[in-house]
Amino acid sequence: FSEKNLPLLTSDAKLSKEYDAIIGSQTVRWEGEEVTLTQLSPVMLKTDRKNREKAWKMAAKRRLEDRQSINEIWIKILKTRMSIAKNSGYGDYRAWRWEYLKRFDYTPEDCLTFHRSIEKVIVPLADKLLKNRKEALGLEKLKPWDLSVDIYGREPLSPFKDAGELEDKCHNIFKSVDPVLGEYFGVMRKENLLDLDNRKGKAPGGYCTEYPFQRLPFIFMNAVGTHSDVQTMIHEGGHAFHVFESAELPFSSQRDVGMEFAEVASMAMELLASPYLTVDNGGFYTDKESSRARIEHLEKIIMFWPYMAVVDAFQHWAYTNPDKALNPDNCDSEWSDLWKRFQMSEHIDYSDCGDIISTGWHNKLHIYHVPFYYVEYGMAQLGSIQIWGNSLRDRKKAIQDYRAALSLGGNATLPELYEAAGAKFSFDDETLLNAANLISLGCILGEN
């Protein structure tokens, strides 16, 4: 702690808000209406390729209009964070932030090992998925606006009509995963601990929070009838079950779980619930639709890890080379190099996209709001895949281990929590390769 840092931390927060204001003001005219870039994003799912290209280029052009403004904010933020580290006696901001985030169970070098493993194991697998996408779409090369559309030209899944149906069917799914988890969700329904439907004037987003005195969870979201809503409900359900399972721990500090494992609870639940999404289990889908949902989910996991590595590696570079990172041109260059390392593929044509690729670091809010907070998602996803793999071998034991690990709250180290759940807190080639093989198997089973 350094009293000198109090005004600097306030300044850091204010600069993040300035960044938000810039991003929030980014709108374009689309089909006669002014829309935000977020509101424009569903066009990327449409089968009309010319419209996708038009929307992508329009969004890219609008983002680049704020290039100078975001560069200026970045310089101020970086200088502020350099001063915070210096005032506290740390050699660089990464070292200060590591301790601030209570990262006692892994080091920066562990993260760099994770990056290298992703490059070696996952990037080639992601490249195969891109090749399959290119061929299925009948294209010589993919363009950036071809990466989200369904490759078979199918309409998006439409699993439910209202929040009541979402509740009912998710309740059935949770009961199928484990009767006790079904009981927990029943308590949430009975005690009005769910606010799921989208309505005018409601705050955006979705999350699970806890009422610490009552030791009960509350789930908030904005369901509109999409498959993403189903995933969100099941994901947040995993967080809610974490609250229930750890409720017997006497002190709130014991129930405070790091994100590296908190997200295992939610991500693993998405996978553990996946066999029960079908109508004959009281769920939403036909067998064919359920297989589609599973494959899309697993493929997104593969595609996420390389992007996560870009975001995390960029921050390791920036905060250990702050003098270079104070020049936004160097940041553009570093991001481009990382993009080539983790995201470039012979199957994608990025020609004429240089500036929008190199300024990709402008678009990831975590860099401005919560530095170094992103790798946790990659770690947790790796843990969740291992738990899911256990369930394919012995479903009953996998669920028992999962619940036992949740009951520990934050009352153990990360390696101990992962081990209790039947997983390994490791980021080496072997661990990632085992996960990749499981995902590949899951995709094959989903197709049959």
Predicted regions and their residues:
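Short, glycine/acidic-rich hinge or "gate" loops at secondary-structure transitions
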Residues: 87-96, 131-146, 183-189, 249-255, ...
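A well-structured
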Residues: 1-157, 169
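Long, K/E/R/D-enriched contiguous segments that form extended
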Residues: 141-169, 288-289, 298, 302-304, ...
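Catalytic Zn2+-binding segment of zinc metalloproteases
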Residues: 238-252, 272
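C-terminal, non-catalytic "cap/extension" segments appended to globular domains
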Residues: 103-105, 233, 241, 271, ...
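Post-HExxH zinc-binding segment in Zn-dependent metallohydrolases
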Residues: 120-121, 257-288, 297, 303, ...
